[in-house]
């Protein structure tokens, strides 16, 4: 019986391992009990918070800076929000494993440069350039994953070094000379369908794939369980290092897609195109409610947070402030997001009494 098997396991493993195994059995029993009650739709705290914040922001924009919510500015905001959403989803996969990826700027720039430099405006060569950009992204992800997942280097140091390496490669590849996008890429990514930017549809498809992969596949559920408790996952026999490393691979693929998209919106690519996405890619993950300590990712909330942060930037821009203030606003949004989800506000209220 299951009870007898449970006793045998407890008698043959060490005390810490037995504790982890016992916790795993209890979690499985609770999950089975929940499933037996039938499906339930649940909205996470992160998604609800960022949804309400986004609605409030749009209301404020319509009252204080109406031009920021007119068709023109919104049409300009949506493509870049879509790019940020995809980059944020990549960062989310890494943060789920209690890591962080600082190679975002050069990873995005490299993909943009590849899909503009290789075709040289030739539409027939675009597909090969896109496949090359994705293949390079996989290689960069394997490098980051090996350094962090297997060699146990600090994620900040490892990815910062990778970012510098990629920047040097971009400068070698381009010689500091910008390259132009092909008409086909501009038409696919920069065009519209039924009045909606194509980039929004691409971001929605990517979001759907990420949600299905994390929620509906065995590999995705294992990925999330490892992020929640690496020690318990290791005792359960899951390959923690491989999953940690693969998070960086999938993240790089998403960064590459973001880079390809930005090349399809901005006609000229250079080595600095991705610089604006380092802080925001982390901010949207935090604002969406994913813990910096790892655990369950919230992809839908991350995408909504990308819309929130992009519109916030548009709002500040409509007020006529300079770039430095816009950066401070992004940093403040990140700090507020961390405070909302990590501070024990019950203790704060008790301390203030």
Q: At which residue positions do the language-model features occur?
A:
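Single transmembrane alpha-helix segments in multi-pass membrane proteins
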Residues: 56-122, 146-152, 283-299, 332
């Amino acid at each position: 019986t299951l009870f007898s098997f449970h006793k045998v396991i407890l008698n043959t493993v060490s005390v810490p391992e037995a504790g982890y195994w016992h916790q795993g059995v209890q979690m499985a029993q609770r999950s089975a009990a929940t499933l037996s009650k039938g499906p339930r739709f649940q909205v996470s705290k992160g998604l609800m918070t960022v949804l309400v914040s986004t609605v409030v922001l749009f209301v404020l924009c319509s009252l204080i800076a109406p031009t920021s919510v007119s068709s023109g500015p919104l049409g300009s905001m949506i493509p870049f929000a879509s790019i940020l959403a995809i980059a944020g989803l990549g960062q989310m996969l890494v943060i789920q494993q209690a890591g962080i990826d600082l190679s975002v700027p050069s990873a995005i720039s490299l993909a943009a440069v590849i899909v503009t430099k290789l075709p040289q405006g030739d539409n027939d060569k675009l597909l090969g350039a896109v496949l090359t950009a994705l293949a390079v992204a996989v290689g960069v992800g394997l490098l980051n994953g090996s350094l962090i997942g297997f060699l146990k280097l600090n994620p900040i140091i490892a990815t910062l070094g990778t970012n510098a390496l990629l920047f040097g490669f971009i400068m070698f590849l381009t010689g500091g000379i910008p390259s132009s996008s092909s008409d086909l890429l501009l038409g696919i990514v920069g065009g519209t369908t039924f009045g909606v930017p194509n980039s929004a549809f691409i971001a929605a498809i990517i979001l759907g794939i990420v949600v299905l992969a994390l929620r509906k596949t065995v590999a995705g559920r294992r990925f999330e369980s490892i992020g929640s408790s690496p020690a318990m996952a290791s005792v359960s026999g899951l390959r923690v290092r491989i999953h940690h490393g693969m998070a960086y691979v999938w993240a790089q693929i998403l960064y590459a897609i973001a880079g390809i998209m930005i090349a399809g919106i901005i006609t000229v690519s250079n080595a600095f195109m991705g610089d604006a996405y380092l802080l925001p890619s982390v901010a949207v993950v935090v604002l969406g409610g994913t813990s910096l300590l790892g655990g369950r990712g919230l992809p839908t909330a991350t995408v909504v947070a990308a819309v929130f942060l992009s519109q916030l930037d548009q709002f500040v821009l409509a007020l006529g402030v300079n770039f430095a203030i816009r950066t401070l606003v992004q940093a403040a949004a990140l700090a507020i997001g961390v405070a909302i989800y990590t501070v024990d506000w019950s203790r704060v209220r008790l301390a203030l009494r």
